[in-house]
């Protein structure tokens, strides 16, 4: 379901509840739904806004399309819970377990998932705008086409995660582990990857313009045909990385290690580099300030 369609469904569900209840009736409705959950019953499309479910064990529960904004789910056990298209805007999920969950199309905007365990979760198409995911475990997670604008994923484990076509503008990945992650066609303009581990990551056709990759490790990473216009790669570890066909206009490469870096088909003519900087790089149809270089063809 598209994000706009999902939001209209959530608003419709909320409006129907409002028309039928008010005041303490809201609290009674939430309390009744919480009791259903704790009794092991499903609660698809339930109204659980503000619910207190700290430490609750909801293994394999059906919470599809639930409206659970600003809920307290700290340390809750939610493994394999169906939360497709659910609305958990602003909820507190610090330390929660959400491993192997189906969270496709979920709305977790502004939620706090500090230290949450979400390995192999399906977050494809999820709304994670401004979410706090620092120190979370998302290894092997599916984040294809997820919206992570302004999200904080600092020191998060995203090893082998799939972020193909994800929206990552101004997201914070500082010191995150993205070893072997897939970010092909991701939109990461202005994102912060400083100190991140991108060893062996796939970033083909990704938009990393104005991104900060200071001191990042992207040994053997694939940046072919990526847009790195104005990006900062100073002090980066780049040995074996592939930048063939990438846009490196205005890139800051100060003190970066370019040994064994594939620069085939790139234009470096506007960068302040000397032949010594490129002596160990792979150059083929590579434009520099001193002419086209073809030593690696």
Q: Which residues fall in each region the model found?
A:
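Bacterial N-terminal signal peptides
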Residues: 2-13
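Cleavable N-terminal signal peptides
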Residues: 13, 17-21
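Tandem repeat scaffolds
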Residues: 23-297
């Amino acid at each position: 379901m598209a994000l706009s369609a999902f939001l209209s469904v959530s608003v419709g569900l909320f409006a129907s509840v409002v028309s039928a209840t008010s005041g303490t009736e809201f609290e009674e409705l939430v309390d009744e739904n919480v009791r259903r959950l704790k009794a092991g019953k499903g609660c698809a499309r339930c109204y659980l806004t503000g619910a207190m479910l700290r430490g609750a064990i909801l293994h394999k529960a059906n919470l599809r399309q639930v409206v659970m904004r600003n809920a307290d789910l700290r340390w809750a056990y939610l493994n394999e819970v169906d939360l497709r298209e659910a609305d958990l805007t602003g909820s507190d999920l610090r330390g929660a377990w959400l491993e192997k969950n189906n969270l496709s199309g979920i709305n977790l905007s502004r939620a706090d998932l500090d230290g949450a365990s979400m390995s192999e979760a399906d977050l494809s198409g999820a709304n994670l705008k401004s979410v706090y995911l620092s120190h979370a475990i998302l290894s092997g997670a599916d984040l294809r086409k997820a919206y992570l604008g302004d999200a904080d994923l600092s020191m998060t484990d995203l090893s082998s995660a799939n972020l193909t076509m994800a929206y990552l503008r101004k997201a914070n990945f500082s010191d995150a582990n993205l070893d072997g992650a897939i970010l092909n066609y991701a939109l990461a303009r202005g994102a912060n990857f400083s100190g991140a581990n991108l060893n062996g990551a796939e970033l083909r056709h990704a938009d990393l313009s104005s991104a900060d990759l200071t001191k990042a490790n992207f040994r053997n990473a694939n940046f072919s045909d990526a847009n790195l216009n104005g990006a900062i790669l100073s002090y980066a570890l780049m040995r074996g990385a592939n930048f063939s066909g990438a846009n490196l206009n205005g890139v800051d490469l100060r003190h970066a290690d370019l040994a064994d870096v594939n620069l085939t088909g790139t234009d470096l003519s506007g960068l302040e580099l000397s032949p010594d900087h490129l002596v160990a790089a792979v150059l083929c149809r590579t434009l520099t300030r001193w002419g086209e270089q073809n030593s690696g063809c």
